[in-house]
């Protein structure tokens, strides 16, 4: 039998049972910190004094010398930044190389599948599914698993005409950018007319994409310093003015990033140093009987498939392809005494410099600090191919910085250029044959490992204490993941 309640004991109010606060849904993830990564080509500590906006960013944030790779050229360095791997692993051994299976030298390819390794965006998406990436003019953009792509892509008409344009993903972005900014200024991106116009267009495109798409990671390539520093050298007043002009053009983009709370990283692939000695490496191989040409209509063309040895010149680096092992000694003998060559790497040397990849030449030549390699292989300018006097980055079997100049020895060069431009505007075929065959005007180059940090690349971050005393090129990927909150 249950006893009745004792009336002398007052009722105790019921204690409400606390309902636990709902746990955050594990599938709801905090957004990564948005990043803007500016590839300011040719930026060095010395140039920073002429770039007040970037310098303030470095002073309020953090900065450090940035190690580079061999070769210190655009495609190899960018591929290392985005994969965290050396050229021996990702396979980008220069801005181009000899495709042995095709028997052809090809530079400035665009398919991202050429780059091996785990890309930055793949690592980011494993940590944060749905991570979005915009690539505005970094190389190997086509076919990459990025959400937004803008990259130079001329229109090649069937009659041989070439008009400026760009490639975008999604495709509708092409007309959107063209309507807002005008046609991509290809002839201001490279060639005798290369100037600030191209970098301004890229900056404006980047601002538009950030404002309308808000990608988690935005990669932006700014080439302006590449032009006058190669034309005139890094210490010339015109080069210092180019640095100041680019800095002023970047200011609105930096302001946009700050207003959005976007972390900014500005880095460079290499520093450009003063040079005065062109080295005709292919002419030396030809005189030694190792390089072969074939002739059509009086013009000589490199015959890489028949040559016992030839070089793919790429600024201060040249991959030397030797068809048979028994020709290695003769090739070395032809190059060992050539003025302007600092080192000739074979298997062990390539391994030491992380260049031991099947795409590399059997030998790799490194120029002395004040020298650089031409691609020229003809011995008489009367037999040069007609493309030698044109801006033809896809036909020349090596890099040609002389394309930045109009021929100073041709009194009619401006008339020729104007005539070609008039024919172009009328929709007629034209040849802009204005490029000199004299390499001596070039005053700046890159490709070697720099002699000092002052001459080398730099990394700046808007976040204080984000970097230590030095950053390796292979550490850029992990740094960006950490800055995004994904490392």
Give, region by region, the residue ranges found by the protein language model.
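Active-site-proximal N-terminal segment of extracellular/periplasmic enzymes that hydrolyze or transfer
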Residues: 2-5, 9-12, 17-65
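His/Asp/Glu-rich, glycine-adjacent segments
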Residues: 3-4, 9, 17-23, 85-233, ...
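Beta-strand elements within well-structured catalytic alpha/beta cores of enzymes
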Residues: 30-46, 57, 81, 124, ...
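Secreted, luminal/periplasmic, and some membrane-associated catalytic domains
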Residues: 31-33, 72-73, 97-113, 117-118, ...
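Glycine-/proline-rich flexible loop or hinge segments
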Residues: 35-40, 59-65, 73-78, 95-109, ...
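Short, structured active-site-proximal loop/turn typified by the sulfatase FGly-forming signature C/S-X-P-X-R
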Residues: 46-89, 132-134
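Short glycine/proline-rich, acidic loop/turn segments that cap or connect secondary-structure elements
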Residues: 441-460
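C-terminal helical/tail subdomains of lipid-metabolizing enzymes
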Residues: 467-477
